[in-house]
């Protein structure tokens, strides 16, 4: 295995351990990026920050199919803060996205990958 394959395998292992700890109500990773780097757009036009949260930020049909007023609105900003400070869910996509944008997890993944190759 090459370095990239090893690092990706380590990332998957770290991701699984984070999810397992979150499932046990042990907040391991705060700072979720749901609603900041990702969003959900339903077939009805509802814009949501996350698939798990029962929160609708607005409907794209009400803004002439323009996302910006919803994305930059007060409700979206409020939920971003709430998610970043209090969310530690088990939704793999959000865990993975958050890992990619937090140096702590990038360094941990790289360190474990390099250690595996030694």
Regions found by a protein language model. Give the residues of each.
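Accessory C-terminal segments flanking Radical SAM cores
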Residues: 1-108
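Iron-sulfur (Fe-S) cluster-binding modules
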Residues: 108-118
